[in-house]
Amino acid sequence: MQKHYTVAWFLYSAPGVDPSPPCRSLGWKRKKEWSDESEEEPEKELAPEPEETWVVEMLCGLKMKLKQQRVSPILPEHHKDFNSQLAPGVDPSPPHRSFCWKRKREWWDESEESLEEEPRKVLAPEPEEIWVAEMLCGLKMKLKRRRVSLVLPEHHEAFNRLLEDPVIKRFLAWDKDLRVSDKYLLAMVIAYFSRAGLPSWQYQRIHFFLALYLANDMEEDDEDPKQNIFYFLYGKTRSRIPLIALFQKLRFQFFCSMSGRAWVSREELEEIQAYDPEHWVWARDRARLS
């Protein structure tokens, strides 16, 4: 019996031997390693749950109807992370982008070379459309679409300057029946000046008759009266025949400078006349002759 106690005492007192139970030391060691690994791993942030907001769906009078809408938690960086997880060496962009960009680049270089060879044509901007209040009745408002006119004061000044031309004066005095140059046709001349895109000081006698001839093409069915424009411009000699062909060519160029916008609304004509309602030109009304 004493021998067994001596062996036990020897085992417990031996250097380097842990007197604690072996199972406890092994379990504590594993628990320690697991806690260290858990501390090394970064904590994963949980994505915020999608929130719900209230948005205005319909506004009727003084009542407002709200609609519940879910806000998506997807952000741009999520798309960026998704693209980065693709197979290495794979371009997330479309495969034909470089080829299309190359062809687009070549086309752009060719267009720049063609622009250097040909002079640039300055076109007049197209008129914009706005909505204006036409009638207000109680809490209801009636809107009407209205075209914004591009006629500026300098276009009226160019028109008034050309009225002092002696040839134009004789032509207007000759047209007593107002078959070629009534107030609406003359107002269209001002509208064409604003659409052609030329500076006001460049408009000359030929531009006045080109615009007036084109206005007759748009509004008048009788072709004979406007042929008298050639008589006041070139006379009655045979040498005027090539000049008439040149006039028709210039008329087409003038039409193209307006981008083919030769139609003028009645509202715009009245607006042009309202700029200076006391002008003597607006007294050329066919209704007063009958």
UniProtKB/Swiss-Prot annotation:
Residues 36-50 have a biased composition (Acidic residues). It holds the Pfam family Spy1. Residues 16-50 are annotated as: Disordered. One of its GO terms (molecular function) is protein kinase binding. Belongs to the Speedy/Ringo family. This is Putative speedy protein-like protein 3. InterPro entries: Speedy (IPR020984). It comes from the Eukaryota.
